[in-house]
Amino acid sequence: MNILVIGSGGREHTLAWKLAQSPKATKLYAVPGNPGMADVAECIGDVDICDNESLVKLAEEKAIDLVVVGPEVPLTNGVVDAMNKAGIKAFGPRKLAAEIEGSKSFSKNLMKKYGIPTAKYEVFTDAEAARDYIKKEGAPIVIKADGLAAGKGVIVAMTLDEALDAVHEIMDDAAFGKAGSRVVIEEFMDGEEASLLAFTDGKTICPMVSSQDHKRAYDGDKGPNTGGMGTYAPAPVMTDEMVKIATERILKPTIAAMAKEGRPYKGCLYAGLMITKEGPKVVEFNARFGDPETQVVLPLLKSDLVDIMLACADGTLDEEHIEWSDGAAVCVVIASGGYPKAYKKGFPIDGLEKAKALGTLVFHAGTAEKDGKIVTSGGRVLGVVATADDIRSAVDKAYKGVNAITFEGAFHRTDIAHRALERLTDK
């Protein structure tokens, strides 16, 4: 089979790496891809991933049998609809279904209508009304831009001033453009966050291994929010019982609700959860694999990813038996100095082969090739991943790989998986 992966980050490198392990994957293409993906796929850099017509044309030229969509923007832009119309199978939700991530107000209203546990909320299009509501509710409180904001449109305000500043930034200053013309304001939920991703064909739902992300830039969960500085799987807070509860109370009802609304959901559904005293509640839904969650979830998948994705596209997921490894995986992100704010690019990266020789996987997130050398080209540059029998061994192995890699201004968190390790110490 010929397979096309759309995207260029660490998530897409992981997807391509896993797909390449399937005996069914005869030829892999990536658009635009990255230098790491070039090990397993032919990268085609001159096609705009938001131009559906060009993507369909490329898929037809290369006789693509399956398209795998990484990022959210092409999904909300209807790339799966365009592929299906051309008779090409694609893994991912159609445009109407991707709205579950594309509009936070749609997602919250859906949960309210179908009784899916989430935080209390109100939706505002008027900044003044939003400010009045915040003054009435008080802090801590959560302010979210309604549309896609590259994972940066959520502000957890611990004080009233922070909350009012957030409304000013999102609505008055239009920091996220049109995405912030409407905001969702939510009650602050107390608890521990975890991510639960699931494969679905619109009827059957198969949860993946749980994971936990580290959003803050610096150790001790300090500093600004980022796209994610590291992850580990499984998350101890997601016990077997908790996964069962989340599947029955959240995942299954959400897929059923989407079908009922005439928006059947196929692909990967990502539930960002808060594990509260009352049980799991939805923080947000994403319409695709998480980044960097994918980097720890897929290395633990024992089954053939191509088979699973085809079953999701064909509506035959109930016939698949999906197996997971009992071990643990840890991903540590190496970022450019200054990230998530302004950073410099173009620094040569050393030690990639050394890290691989230590038994770690190195997924490229923000790299480019220049004069035959791999250089930095993004905020999050690499994800170094280790699998082992347990979390502690995976952490130790991952950091050995991280310490082998150098480039100017590189930084990483040194406490990835600290919550899991603290739980082990407490026992």
Please report, for each region that a protein language model flagged, where it lies by residue.
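Internal nucleotide-binding/catalytic subdomain
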Residues: 153-294
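A conserved helix-loop-beta module that forms one wall/lid of the active-site cleft
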Residues: 91-153
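Solvent-exposed alpha-helices and their adjacent loops that cap or buttress functional pockets
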Residues: 21-23, 36-38, 61, 91, ...
